A protein has these predicted regions:
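Flavin-dependent oxidoreductase catalytic cores
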Residues: 1-242, 246, 250-262, 270, ...
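Glycine-rich dinucleotide-binding loop and its adjacent helix/turn
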Residues: 220-232, 296-297, 307, 326-363
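C-terminal structured "cap/appendage" subdomains that terminate the fold
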Residues: 158-170, 176, 181, 285, ...
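Terminal amphipathic helices with adjacent charged low-complexity linkers/tails
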Residues: 233, 272-275, 325
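Short, contiguous acidic/charged loop-to-helix segments that flank catalytic cores in large enzymes
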Residues: 121-127, 229-231, 236, 277-289, ...
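Beta1-alpha1 glycine-rich phosphate/pyrophosphate-binding loop at the start
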Residues: 108, 241-308
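Short hydrophobic core segments
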Residues: 265, 319-327
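Catalytic cores of nucleotide-enabled group-transfer and carboxylate-activating enzymes in metabolic
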Residues: 285-292, 306-317, 321-322, 345-349, ...
């Protein structure tokens, strides 16, 4: 039932004008469950040996090819690392890759880790392009073009992968939520204007797994492009934005792009708000990128920036609109002893105002 259904779905995609499809054979989804001994406990023609376990995947690719013809692109996302107990061994993965190629795939994409895996693969703390060596390891075994993936968020990272011959292409997903113009900006040689994905997963994967609409912490328009249309204004205003954290920065630059004259106020000596604390945490260095992006964006859009300036009624007079984006304060949890001098907030620690000893309890 599933094999003809996959072929029929691919055929409909072709009829709708698509040049190809990707068959999802990784990340612990249905097809991957057939290939891995962890989940395939069958003792019939579809389970047991590695050859039988990969049969379902191979048959899907073969049927899609038969249904869609020789010139249709079939990308197969192959799990190169399951990263779970009783996953596929490397020799089994190589055998799968060869069988998938023989079945008619056009390109092999790299799948890294099941969703159940406890090994981080895409979070902020994972170094950029951390798993591309696994893609390179497969290259001698197949003749198909290979795609590298996971934590490839800037053009220089992608270019290095291609220049070193690690892969023939790179795959981007979350970076295109952060900045839908990523490829155009890369092609134009303007990487500094890219709103870089920081791999926080807060509004993309977290939302999807909660059955909510995917979006992006850094880009409120992600997946809402038809609802949030930033059109040019017919009546420019003088707008003051108070607070140079992520929300204030986004508001100021969007308003300026729409044609308003914008002044951004912040009492701090630098933009970024609480991102300046986040970037100090080991594993969250990518948060530097958001501040880098908005530094460029403020200059590009002509926003007047007044740092080290406390907004007051006096210096806000004369503006047509005032936007408050002053952020939040740490929530204090009341419990016996919470008023003790040794009870401090994360801001106290990350700012360096308080030095924590060797033993600390975090609530």
């Amino acid at each position: 039932r599933h094999r003809p259904a996959c072929a029929a779905a691919a055929r409909r995609a072709r009829e709708a004008g698509y040049d190809g499809v990707e068959v999802m054979g990784s990340e612990g989804y249905f097809i991957n469950e057939f290939t891995a001994p962890r989940t395939n406990k069958r003792n019939d023609a579809w389970g047991g040996t590695a050859e039988k376990r990969m049969r379902f995947a191979v048959e899907i690719v073969r049927r899609v090819r038969e249904a869609c013809g020789p010139d249709f692109i079939i990308i197969y996302r192959l799990s190169l690392l399951d990263l779970v107990e009783d996953g596929n061994q490397w020799d089994e993965i190589v055998a799968q890759a060869k069988a998938i190629e023989n079945a008619g795939a056009t390109i092999i994409n790299s799948g890294i880790g099941w969703h159940e895996a406890r090994v981080p693969t895409i979070v902020t703390s994972v170094p950029r392009a951390a798993f591309v060596d696994v893609t390179a390891k497969l290259r001698p075994h197949v003749t198909l073009p290979l795609i590298a993936t996971n934590r490839i968020n800037m053009p220089d990272v992608a270019e290095r992968i291609l220049a070193d011959g690690i892969a023939d292409m790179v795959s981007l997903a979350r970076p295109l939520l952060a900045d839908s113009q990523w490829a155009n900006k890369a092609r134009a040689g303007k990487p500094q204007s890219i709103n870089t994905c920081i791999a926080c997963n807060q509004a993309c994967l977290d939302h999807v797994f909660e059955n909510k609409r995917a979006s992006c912490l850094l880009n409120p328009r992600a997946c809402a492009e038809t609802e949030l249309n930033y059109t040019k204004t017919f009546k420019p205003k003088r707008i003051a934005v108070v607070g140079a954290g992520p929300a204030g920065l986004a508001c100021a630059t969007v308003a300026a792009e729409r044609g308003h004259r914008v002044t951004l106020f912040d009492a701090s000596a630098e933009i970024g708000g609480q991102f300046n604390y986040a970037k100090k945490i080991p594993g969250k260095e990518e948060f530097h990128e958001t501040i880098r992006y908005f530094t460029h964006k403020l200059e590009e859009t002509g926003v007047e920036v007044k740092l080290g300036t406390v907004a007051s009624a006096e210096n806000l007079s004369g503006f047509d609109e005032v936007v408050l984006a002053t952020g939040i304060l740490p929530r204090r949890v009341a419990f016996p002893g919470s008023d003790h001098a040794k009870v401090v907030s994360y801001l106290d620690v990350l700012s360096g105002r308080v030095q924590v000893g060797k033993r600390a309890a975090i609530i």
